[in-house]
Amino acid sequence: MNNLPEDCIAKILSLTTPLDVCRLSAVSSIFRSAAGSDDVWNHFLPADFPAGFAAPAGLPTRKQLFFSLVDNPLLINGTLLSFSLERKSGNKCYMMAARALNIVWGHEQRYWHWISLPNTRFGEVAELIMVWWLEITGKINITLLSDDTLYAAYFVFKWNHSPYGFRQPVETSLVLADTESTDNVVQPSMISLMQDSGGEEGQSPVLRRDGWYEVELGQFFKRRGDLGEIEMSLKETKGPYEKKGLIVYGIEIRPVP
């Protein structure tokens, strides 16, 4: 294949994945040159960026833009939603800020405080002071997501110095409302927010590289032509005891590996 013109190699590479292109760039100098082509990386960038998207300055190549969107999520829609790309596939990822979520009693200072923490994407996160009724819901338009892709939604959080009341499981659901998909079903499940609460495999939180925890709320498949909203929620409203110490970063929606 080294005898093929570089533009032909670039065309072939554009039919693979970003991960494959990075691997194949080590084959030879002509592959390395073709792997840096804008034609290749245009194929991996979305054809329809979300409204409000503005490419960062100082990125002269499409490859640089791609990896900037992988490593540095961009804020859109003010400061309530971040947009990024998944490294292996180039599929779209989003994270909804805590302020974009419907948190019951979230505007009552005796129950929740809105605080700023370093090294976060958004200006504020929500710190739980005390509630008995915990209910958090987020919605996102399914048309923002990449077609023909399996997605998962993750609740992203951490604890302050004195968490209390979270030893019991928390109920979650994921609803594909008003879509044309045949999979527009509710996925109720029980998860643990505490790592040592004995939750089932896959239902306990995982520590992320950024120092926050995440726990999966559910999965859904985005088909071409799907319309409507995805509603993601978690709640604990049955326990007769107070809950406190939870810090909410947001909900992240990204492709399943």
Swiss-Prot record:
SMART domains in the cross-refs: FBOX (SM00256)
InterPro entries: F-box-like_dom_sf, F-box_dom, PP2-like
GO cellular component, as recorded: nucleus
Residue ranges occupied by any F-box domain in the UniProt entry: 1-44
GO annotation (BP), single: protein ubiquitination
Metabolic or biological pathway: Protein modification; protein ubiquitination
Gene Ontology MF, one: carbohydrate binding
Main localization (coarse): nucleus
Pfam families cross-referenced by the UniProt entry: F-box, PP2
Cell compartments where the protein resides: Nucleus
Keywords, ordered alphabetically: Nucleus, Ubl conjugation pathway
Domain notes: The F-box is necessary for the interaction with ASK proteins.
Assembly notes: Part of a SCF (ASK-cullin-F-box) protein ligase complex. Interacts with SKP1A/ASK1 and SPK1B/ASK2.
Protein purpose: Component of SCF(ASK-cullin-F-box) E3 ubiquitin ligase complexes, which may mediate the ubiquitination and subsequent proteasomal degradation of target proteins.
Name of this protein: F-box protein PP2-B11
